[in-house]
Amino acid sequence: MADVVLPGRSYAEKEGTFSNTERRVQRIRKAVEIEGETREDIWIFTEIMNRMGYPQPHLTSAQVMDEVASVTPSFAGISHARLDSEEVAGRGLQWPCTAKDHPGTPIMHVGKFSRGLGLCN
């Protein structure tokens, strides 16, 4: 029996984003309302931090995405609002996406590796 049970939700029960293996960041939206004591992952992580003595406010998934974009240059052009816009229309954005008007990067390392340590043919 577990000492601690974290009452997480499935993807269909929460809001947020996910990144797939082609670096595409897409929105997920709550499809069903649930009853009971389950919580979104971000709520669980924040509660663990608070209980360990690292006080943090409870943020929405949009606020977390905005913070990620503010500290991670390759995500600087990604936000919930942009992912929800007609411009993106459910396709998502592929990082690096370095500015609010950047279209995303479908192919990385064209011709060479970003650090110049190898060669792509």
Could you tell me what each predicted segment is?
Residues 1-77:
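Non-catalytic alpha/beta scaffold blocks inside enzyme catalytic domains
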Residues 65-121:
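Long, low-complexity segments enriched in small/aliphatic residues
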